[in-house]
Each structure stands twice: as C-alpha cells, then as structure tokens.
Amino acid sequence: MLKTISPIDNSLYSEIPYASDSIIENTLTSSHKAKTTWKNTNLQERKKLIVKFVDCFLSNSKEIEEELSKQMGRPISQCAGELRGFEERAKYMINNAERALDKVISKNDNEFDNYVSKDPLGTIFVIAPWNYPYNTSVNSIVPSLLAGNCVILKHSSQTPLCAEQLLKAAKKSGIPESVFQILHLDHVSTSKIISDHRINHVLFTGSVSGGREIKKAIGTRFIGAGLELSLIHI
C-alpha cells in the first residue's frame, strides 16, 4: 500500500493500493492502442478538450487546495497560488500550440523541400515530484497531450491525490480514458515501465539520484528522456 503521512501532524492522510501487474499491463496496452487515434485527432479538437480539462480541474479548487496542504504541509493560504500557476502555464501552452507544433522550414531550393516536422512520439511516461506537484506536472502533461501523445502519470508517493485530481478532471473533460492515465507505483515497477517497449519517452522532475536511475532504466533502449534535476537541466 502507498501510505502518505501528512507533515502537518504526522497522521496517515491517505492509503492507496499500488498498481498490480495486471493494471500496469492494461494501462500500457490501452495507451499503446490509443496513440494512433489521438495522434490523428486534429489539433483544434485536442485544444478544446485540454481547455475543458483545465476548467474542470480548477472548478474543484477548494478540495484540491485542502488536499495539497495536508499532503505536503504547505499553508493552505499559499496553495491557491499554485493553481493560478497551473492555469497560467496551461493556457500559455494551449494558446501557443499552433506556433510551437508547426513545422520549421530550414531551407528552400528548387530541388527539395527542407523542413523539420514535429510528430508525436507515442506514449509519454511522466514522473512528477511533490514540491510543486501541479506546476511541474502541467509542464509535461499539457504539451505532451497537445502534441498528440498519450500520457501515463506517476506522481510522488507524498502527493498521490494530485494524480487522482488530474485524472478526475481529464475524465470529466472528455479526454479519452486511454489517452491520459495514472499509476501508483513503487521503484521496481517504475523501472519496469520505463524499460517497456510501449513507452516512447520519459519526462522526470526530481532528484539527481532519481535522474540517474531513469537513465539506467532507458540505457538499453533508443528513447529520449527529459530530466529536470534539482537545478540541473539535461
């Protein structure tokens, strides 16, 4: 069981079962199957769904702020600021999606069309930290979905209910269930998922030691990883 102890009073705040092998397999399989349909969904439709996702998330702000305070020990008066940051970041990425995802013309000549095309990778595995659990995760989730990728989110064991709130908003918004999913995982299962051929990219925010483990897990595979590591960006 994944047990979260509140720093406020050292009480047991939440207790959630870790994902079983069958749940992990079903999640990977459904995400792998969904990636083609989501990739072929036009950008305007993806944007509409993600706008709804953000609105649905913010509509539950009072509950989210209370949970956030109890999970990580931040004064509740300061929790609203993170939700404002979530909204600002998400809206910026939504509003700039066409420009960011448009192909880049590198050179024109009479014989060839030279350009860089920005295509979806497939399934993105996002590993998010506890310290800014929404502001860090939105930086990975929203651009991944906008670009036509499916997302599987694994949140910190200190803030697992943040993943639950994001999933609740995604379901309410109409984003297909297999396009955005969450898993509660231990370290062993996390490494196995990273090594699975159905994961096409990893986005991790956390410690330097955690980043090293990510690199080890993808060491035998030809996939990329975005690592934001305690003031170090790779």
Question: Where do the model's predicted regions map?
Answer:
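Short loop-to-beta-strand entry elements in the cores of soluble alpha/beta enzymes
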Residues: 45, 49, 147-158, 162, ...
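Short alpha-helical
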Residues: 22, 59, 63, 74, ...
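N-terminal Rossmann-like NAD(P)+-binding subdomain of aldehyde/semialdehyde dehydrogenases
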Residues: 1-113
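Hydrophobic packing residues within well-ordered alpha-helices of enzyme cores
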Residues: 90, 163-166, 193, 214
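Conserved small-residue-rich beta-alpha loop and adjacent elements
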Residues: 105-176, 200
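Conserved NAD(P)+-binding/catalytic subdomain of aldehyde/semialdehyde dehydrogenases
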Residues: 123, 174-232
